[in-house]
Amino acid sequence: MTVADAKKTADQKMQKSIETLKADLAKVRTGRAHTGILDHVMVEYYGNPTNLTQVANVTLIDARTIGVQPFEKKMVAVVEKAIRDADLGLNPATQGEMIRVPTPPLTEERRKEMVKLVKSEAEDAKIAIRNIRRDANETLKKLLKDKACSEDDERRAQDEIQKLTDKFVLEVDKLVVEKEKEVLTV
């Protein structure tokens, strides 16, 4: 491994941490409906647990209602039960072949819980990013010890990795501010 490899690996892993945070934040319910809250609902499909998006079309009907239309008519009841059992606080209602999923407005208390959850997810992402920095710095020290790079190269690479860390931590903070604003908007 070279100094450039260590930097590239750290960058890729930090980027992955940001992607994971974005995915986690998408699961957090806000006052508005969005199809992302149903992304992880699993449906029993011919005996196999299958992602809801594989067996139904999920769309927004309006700001507070999600529409779920199973591809097969016989799946309507199964999909409705899966959404109800997903522990998302949602109460789907079937209208013919379409399942309407109204998202109730969040109470003030629930909004504050969601903000805490968002901050917790962000802190986990920051910890992951810092751990990646630590691993990269240890790799650089090992390269220096093995005489694969000079002290100047190691110092320069550490500075660049620190800049990467700062950049990604700033991005985490930005994502959190956006999500908090979204959660607290009534």
UniProtKB/Swiss-Prot annotation:
Give the subcellular location: Cytoplasm
Q: Which GO terms describe its molecular function?
A: ribosomal large subunit binding
Q: Which InterPro entries match?
A: Ribosome_recyc_fac, Ribosome_recyc_fac_dom, RRF_sf
- The reply to whether Cytoplasm figures as a keyword in the UniProt entry is yes
Q: Which controlled-vocabulary keywords does the entry list?
A: Cytoplasm, Protein biosynthesis
GO BP, sorted A to Z: cytoplasmic translational termination
NCBIfam families per record: frr
What protein family does this chain belong to? Belongs to the RRF family.
Q: What is this protein called?
A: Ribosome-recycling factor
